[in-house]
A protein has these predicted regions:
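Nucleotidyltransferase catalytic core that binds NTPs
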Residues: 1-196
Length: 196
């Protein structure tokens, strides 16, 4: 049980597969908008993951520690493949606080098909972060509103990086400095330290 926060709590679950500079920019932007931000690594039932949940959670935890903002916390206990379960856990952690569920605009079209989508949208305020190449269309917005949501589009500038692209192209420049040593040490995603 955590004491109710002053103001809303932003909730951001991510595959963090691996965490990118885009994740870093998003988390840094969220702490400028919300008094408390919780993040965790999660398994997305619609994705194949390149590392285990435990490994991805460790990497995300390292990124959160490197950001070092007291408004940002790594809350792995919120993780669930199902958003409704995460929201139930968050409501128990922050009773009485407004919960703001943060997703990228690439997921906006998927939300109406999520398990118990109407209940999810009834328990939180939906905040959508623009992602390059994935505009939030009026059709997406109307589908969300039909389920009772009043989505808010956050004015954050996030670098056009995607974990899947980093995995496919092995581009270390898109990996936050705090995460890169662990990827090299453990040879994650094909990134290995050069032999001595």
């Amino acid at each position: 049980f955590v004491k109710a926060a002053e103001g809303p709590v932003a909730l951001f679950g991510t595959s963090a597969d691996p965490p990118t500079r885009g994740h870093q920019a998003l988390l840094e932007g969220l702490v400028q908008l919300y008094p408390q931000v919780a993040t965790w690594a999660s398994d997305n039932p619609q994705k194949h993951h390149g590392a285990t949940l435990e490994q991805r959670a460790t990497l995300l935890g390292e990124l959160v520690a490197a950001i070092g903002d007291p408004r940002l916390s790594h809350r792995q206990e919120l993780s669930s493949p199902w958003a409704i379960t995460t929201l139930e856990r968050a409501a128990a952690q922050w009773p009485g606080s407004e919960l703001v569920f943060v997703v990228g605009s690439d997921l906006a079209a998927q939300i109406p098909s999520w398990k118990q989508a109407d209940q999810i949208l009834g328990r939180c305020r939906l905040a959508i972060v623009p992602r390059h190449g994935w505009p939030l269309t009026s059709q997406h917005r109307e589908a969300l509103e039909a389920l009772g949501s009043r989505p808010v589009e956050l004015a954050l500038q996030i670098p056009a990086t995607a974990s899947s692209a980093v995995r496919e192209r092995l581009d270390p420049s898109q990996i936050p400095a705090a995460v890169l040593p662990a990827l090299l040490k453990h040879n994650r995603y094909g990134l290995a330290e050069p032999p001595c």
